[in-house]
Amino acid sequence: MQKYLKEARSLLALGIPVIIAQFSQTAMGVVDTVMAGSVSATDMSAVAVGTSIWLPVILFGYGLLLALTPIIAQMNGSGRRNLIASQTQQGFWLAIFLSIIIIAILYNSKFLIDRQHNIDPILAEKAVGFIHAIMWGAPGYLFYQVLRNQCEGLSKTKPGMVISFLGLLINIPINYIFIYGKFGAPALGGVGCGVATASVYWVMFLLMRWYVKRASSQRDIRPKHRFAAPEWHILKRISALGLPIAMAVFFEITLFAIVALLISPLGVTAVAGHQIAQNFSSLMFMFPISLAAATTIRVGYNLGKKSIENARISAYTGIMVGLVFACLTATFSIILREPIALMYNDNPEVITMASHLMLFAALYQLSDAIQVVGAGVLRGYKDTRSIFYITFIAFWILGLPSGYILGLTDYIVPAMGPQGFWIGFIIGLTASAVMIFARISWTQKQPDEVILQHSTH
């Protein structure tokens, strides 16, 4: 028991800074929406539409680069710190390639937006302007993630916390300048949010680079050459590990986007209630996703030290701590569901709908904690392909079809509307949690030499 309590303290020491960093980055999006809304409803809607296209694309790149964390954590644990700099250099090359692809996709976003029926032309123009502004921040964001993953792989999570919080603070005045046209800048409205966010991402990268170059804990991690050509075998290994993570992230984001579209014909009350429940759930999601990052670091580090037993302790401690947090956030969601809904909207019908859906959201958080932290465990073991297959089956084969059948058809019960889709979420996430937990158990039953060979490959 003492081992698990000690591990829980180590996990929380790593995880709490990640939680603050995640909340800071999420808050940047909230600030953009609120400040754009102060100009006009059209500007706020343009930011929302633009963000719905920007997020899946950029988070795909984020997911791909997440592979660096377990790679670096295991090198750190095994005493091979001399190899870390080359992994980071190749991470930058991967970020460059990703940035080119992302900018090319986002540059052509006008075609996607114009395909939406009955969209207001001014709204479409502003949304495209927002995307064309924020896309130039993609390289800065991805470069920042490369260095953040290096730090987190070395069990240094506080730099990401501090710099993300500074990014949030810097975002507000830059938004003010470009939205309202202050200090000689043009008044860009919602498009100014894109300019500000892109600028902040570059500032965050430069701050993280400054830290990494001066941190005493990383003085021994220096590249042999200031410029290193792409090493295709390293890039291939990072991509092979990161692509399943990126696809899993993409599956989850697009699932929620498609459900929002399927609910949209059910009326304003249904859409607003669903949006409130989903938005609040996404805030609560910061807890398990941050603990998952900490668990990946601890599992990877212990495997690097060839300590199979400590890696197992890290894995189960991470899942248990995640469940404790989920029980707390679920209880909070149930008890305060009406006041929470009132923070978003004062329409009685919307509040009733949102409050009802928050009950489903509370159940959802328990399964979500297991599957998210469990995925972090599997990343630590470098078993990312299974995450890809499990999330695809759970979300797209089980969750979405069951939600559609319950929400919009009379095949099993009379059409339940948004509630049916939330039951679908619970089915999908529970299936994912069961399959991921089973995969962890199977992995840990393998012979020690097989686990170490796979995890250090």
Swiss-Prot record:
Which keywords describe this protein according to UniProt? Antiport, Cell inner membrane, Cell membrane, Ion transport, Membrane, Sodium, Sodium transport, Transmembrane, Transmembrane helix, Transport
User: In which domain of life is the source organism classified?
Assistant: Bacteria
Q: Where in the cell is it found?
A: Cell inner membrane
User: What's one GO BP annotation on this UniProt entry?
Assistant: sodium ion transport
Q: How does it sit in the membrane?
A: Multi-pass membrane protein
Question: What's one GO MF term for it?
Answer: antiporter activity
Q: Per the record's keyword annotation, is Acyltransferase included, yes or no?
A: no
GO cellular-component terms in the record?
plasma membrane
Q: What is its main location?
A: membrane
Annotated InterPro entries: MATE_fam, MATE_MdtK, MdtK-like, Multidrug-R_MdtK
A Pfam family reported for this protein in Swiss-Prot or TrEMBL: MatE
- Keyword Cytoplasm tagged: no
Task: Give the stretches traversing the membrane.
Answer: 11-31, 53-73, 93-113, 127-147, 160-180, 188-208, 243-263, 280-300, 316-336, 357-377, 387-407, 418-438
Question: Its family?
Answer: Belongs to the multi antimicrobial extrusion (MATE) (TC 2.A.66.1) family. MdtK subfamily.
Described by its record, this protein's role is as follows: Multidrug efflux pump that functions probably as a Na(+)/drug antiporter.
What's the protein called, per UniProt? Multidrug resistance protein MdtK
Output the lineage of the source organism: Bacteria, Pseudomonadati, Pseudomonadota, Gammaproteobacteria, Enterobacterales
Annotated gene: mdtK
